[in-house]
Amino acid sequence: MRIVAVDIGGTMIKSGLWNGETFVELRETETRASEGGAALMERVKGLIHSYHDFEAIGISTAGEVNTEDGSIFYANSNIPGYTGMPVKQIMEEEF
């Protein structure tokens, strides 16, 4: 199974494609946290779209995640507007 893995940090977004044996197509871009949660989600979607032929997406993120609905339960003020962001819903609608 080919899986896009994304790690959203306070300063960098790191990603890679797991091909079942190892990570390939590793990428890294600035989070630009001060631009806010909505802009961050657009950056993440664009990054994921840069991969091809994947079957699943895994995301780890700064902040606390509500495991029931995949939204950000709490994020500090470094990413304005990130608390309450429905990350899972956004990704499901896009992909």
Task: Give the residues covered by each predicted segment.
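Short glycine-rich, Thr/Ser-proximal phosphate-binding strand/loop in the N-terminal lobe
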Residues: 2-42, 71-74
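Short, basic and Ser/Thr-rich N-terminal targeting/leader segments
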Residues: 11, 53-55, 95
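Short, acidic Gly/Pro/Ser/Thr-rich loop/turn segments
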Residues: 13, 64-66
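Glycine-rich phosphate-binding loop and adjoining helix at the ATP-binding site
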Residues: 37-38, 66-95
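Phosphate/pyrophosphate-binding loops at sites that engage ATP/ADP/AMP, CoA/4′-phosphopantetheine
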Residues: 44-57
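Glycine-rich beta-strand-to-loop/alpha-helix junction loops that act as flexible
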Residues: 57-63
